Amino acid sequence: MLLPWLNEELIEAGCDEAGRGCLAGAVYAAAVILPKDFENELLNDSKQLSEKQRYALREVIERDAVAWAVGIVSPEEIDKINILNASFLAMHRAVDRLKTRPQHLLIDGNRFKKYPDIPHTTVIKGDGKYLSIAAASILAKTYRDDYMNKLHQEFPCYDWEHNKGYPTKKHRAAIAGHGTTPYHRMTFNLLGDGQLELFSK
């Protein structure tokens, strides 16, 4: 079972991101404040759940959470500030949108850029340790998946419906054959074979 909180006395928000390693699309983050007595045996790291389970849990989280929000950073912004800073910014934007102000942030990972006036704790593999981070992981992933599925309708040859923008062979072959889209992150090694510089000339 995942832990319900780090500090029972504080209003805690769990934060996580999705899409950091993708070649295309925005990075998404979510922040979730759960009730102190929240329990759900299925809730776990979103990567270990089926797609059907993630979407079912999203409904539960949105219904039962004290507050939840999603933050988005565009591919253009990612290229300007780099993906690490973009991940932090997406989490900041999610926290900005929470209707209840948290007193403490639980961050998945080992690094974070401090949010103004709210202390934080980073937790390595936190989505497998704390309920609120696991909940944030599910919201970030499912909302980003919805977004990539919509982009797939516009550019079906990149197979975003299945790869969600991650660097699969089919995705990279489509980039080599069809070029890039406005949704590709141009500062990333899109072809993965050292040929990006030649490709972009």
Swiss-Prot record:
GO terms for biological process: DNA replication, removal of RNA primer; mismatch repair. Its cofactor is Mn(2+); Mg(2+). It catalyses: Endonucleolytic cleavage to 5'-phosphomonoester. It holds the Pfam family RNase_HII. One of its GO terms (cellular component) is ribonuclease H2 complex. It is found in: Cytoplasm. Keywords: Cytoplasm, Endonuclease, Hydrolase, Manganese, Metal-binding, Nuclease. Its EC number is 3.1.26.4. Residues 10-200 form the RNase H type-2 domain. Disulfide bonds: none annotated. Endonuclease that specifically degrades the RNA of RNA-DNA hybrids. Belongs to the RNase HII family. This is Ribonuclease HII. It comes from Bacteroides fragilis (strain ATCC 25285 / DSM 2151 / CCUG 4856 / JCM 11019 / LMG 10263 / NCTC 9343 / Onslow / VPI 2553 / EN-2).
